């Protein structure tokens, strides 16, 4: 009992709560700005923790992480501009709500789903972290390849009514990902100048395809009176929405947690896998892509589930689940702490304070989210003549901020033109982003697995985890083909 009270006292001390609140608020603002990812936010604000105690510093960084993943949904819903890669799936359906005057409802669904996904990941963090972390360590190159292939199969389900167009777009995304230095042989591929040696970055491409293309489209009718309905009819989800959220978000939150445990698989993958799972569970899969509450709930539950999942291997094994967790390891090291099994023995109170702090951060996030929905939706009442230049500026700043490279700005502009042209011929842009994100992961692990096995393809059928992913791939493809035949 004294241990539990010590944990509660540590997590709920006024100073720690203040730092967590500040972290969540900063994270939401960072996440809502296109191009400023959760990783960038945590990295930029890491120096602020140097003078803090370990508990305050780590929980403030966790607050930034939780807030940024949720914050990406705000611009995704209001402007069709994912603030972070984790919200790319949210933009598909979320923006459809805004177009029909239901932005408040969509933000409410996203906020509650984010909270539920985060809470599910916190429960997993508390209850089964050691066991799940051990499972994640069993992932070899073969398992990572099949995970990436499973993610790529989602392209078939997010392609809308024309699977062929979606598959072509996804293939182009994969092809784009091959530009740069080969990760296995270091051979230079498809590079015209030094700027392409590191490859085509997916964040400028994502900003271009989603945001800049939308800005170009807006320019065409900038003086028209056909504005998006900015009225806020609801600030909370309907009863039916809540039922949908309670059915979908816990499942996708659990999926996101499992994805987060796997090193290298981030919130963007958790979001798309959750989206695809919900589509398979839905009685009305044809509504996905047209403004489905299930779709928004699934995406946000999945990406916020990753936040707790990524902490599991970090704390129990000292292995980062994603880039943010890697920064967290650095923050702990600065405090003189070494993440891993010994941390549970030497600093048990701190570990369980982090567990409880994740729950508190998610609670602060949901309270801030619902409190500010009306403020968020004011963006829609801004005239197009003002909003469009602002979107242009955000796109330029967001694409430049990642590497401070104007070449990325050019990449974003080219992607924007391509996305605008794709919209003209009704080709979905989401498959290209998915291909660009998962293509390198699939290629690298496919080739590494074959190198380790001396070219024997049996390596992809050796373990129960491989068979599990093969079954998921078959199920996903079967469902997509059956849906197209109908």
Summary of predicted features, one role per range:
Residues 30-39, 77-88, 120-124, 259-268, ...:
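Short helix-coil transition sites and intra-membrane helix breaks within transmembrane domains
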Residues 38-48, 61, 76-96, 127, ...:
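Re-entrant/interfacial helical elements at transmembrane boundaries that shape
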Residues 1-57, 130, 137, 188-292, ...:
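Helix-loop-helix hairpins and the membrane-proximal interhelical loops
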Residues 55-59, 96-113, 283-295, 323-326, ...:
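Membrane-interface alpha-helices at helix entry/exit sites of multi-pass transporters
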Residues 65-76, 83, 292-317, 321, ...:
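A structural-propensity feature for long, helix-poor, extended segments
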Residues 108-224, 334-484:
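Membrane-embedded alpha-helical modules
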Residues 24-38, 68-80, 155-160, 253-263, ...:
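Transmembrane alpha-helix interface/packing and boundary motifs in multi-pass membrane proteins
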Residues 66-71, 112-124, 132, 176, ...:
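Membrane-embedded alpha-helical segments of transport systems
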């Amino acid at each position: 009992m004294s241990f539990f009270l010590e944990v509660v006292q540590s997590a709920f001390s006024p100073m720690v709560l203040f730092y967590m609140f500040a972290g969540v608020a900063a994270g939401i603002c960072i996440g809502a700005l296109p191009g400023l990812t959760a990783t960038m936010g945590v990295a930029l604000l890491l120096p602020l923790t140097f003078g803090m105690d370990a508990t305050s510093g780590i929980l403030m960084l966790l607050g930034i992480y939780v807030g940024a993943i949720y914050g990406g949904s705000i611009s995704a819903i209001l402007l069709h501009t994912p603030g972070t890669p984790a919200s790319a799936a949210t933009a598909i359906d979320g923006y459809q709500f805004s177009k029909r005057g239901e932005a408040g409802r969509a933000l409410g669904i996203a906020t509650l789903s984010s909270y539920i996904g985060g809470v599910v990941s916190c429960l997993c963090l508390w209850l089964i972290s050691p066991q799940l972390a051990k499972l994640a360590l069993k992932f070899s190159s073969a398992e990572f390849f099949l995970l990436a292939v499973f993610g790529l199969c989602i392209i078939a389900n997010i392609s809308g009514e024309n699977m062929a167009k979606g598959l072509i777009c996804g293939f182009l995304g994969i092809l784009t990902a091959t530009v740069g230095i080969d990760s296995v042989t270091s051979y230079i591929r498809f590079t015209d100048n030094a700027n392409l040696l590191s490859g085509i970055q997916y964040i400028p491409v994502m900003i271009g395809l989603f945001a800049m293309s939308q800005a170009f489209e807006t320019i065409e009718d900038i003086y028209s009176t056909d504005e998006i309905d900015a009225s806020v009819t609801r600030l909370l989800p309907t009863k039916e929405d809540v039922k949908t959220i309670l059915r979908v978000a816990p499942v996708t939150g659990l999926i996101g947690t499992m994805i987060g445990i796997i090193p290298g698989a981030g919130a963007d993958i958790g979001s798309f896998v959750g989206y695809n799972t919900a589509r398979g569970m839905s009685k009305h899969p044809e509504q996905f892509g047209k403004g489905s509450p299930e779709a928004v709930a699934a995406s946000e539950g999945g990406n916020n589930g990753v936040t707790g999942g990524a902490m599991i291997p970090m704390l129990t094994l000292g292995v980062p689940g994603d880039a943010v967790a890697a920064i967290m390891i650095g923050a702990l090291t600065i405090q003189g702490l070494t993440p891993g099994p010994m941390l549970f023995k030497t600093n048990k109170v701190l570990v369980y304070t982090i567990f409880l702090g994740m729950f508190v951060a998610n609670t602060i996030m949901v309270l801030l989210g619902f409190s500010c929905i009306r403020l968020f939706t004011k963006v829609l009442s801004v005239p197009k003549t003002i909003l469009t230049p602002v979107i242009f500026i955000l796109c330029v700043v967001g694409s430049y901020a990642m590497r401070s490279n104007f070449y990325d700005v050019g990449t974003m502009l080219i992607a924007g033109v391509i996305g605008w042209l794709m919209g003209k011929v009704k080709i979905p842009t989401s498959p290209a982003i998915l291909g660009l994100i998962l293509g390198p992961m699939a290629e690298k692990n496919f080739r590494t697995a074959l190198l380790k096995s001396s070219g024997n393809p049996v390596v992809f059928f050796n373990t129960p985890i491989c068979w599990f992913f093969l079954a998921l791939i078959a199920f996903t493809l079967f469902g997509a083909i059956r849906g197209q035949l109908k």
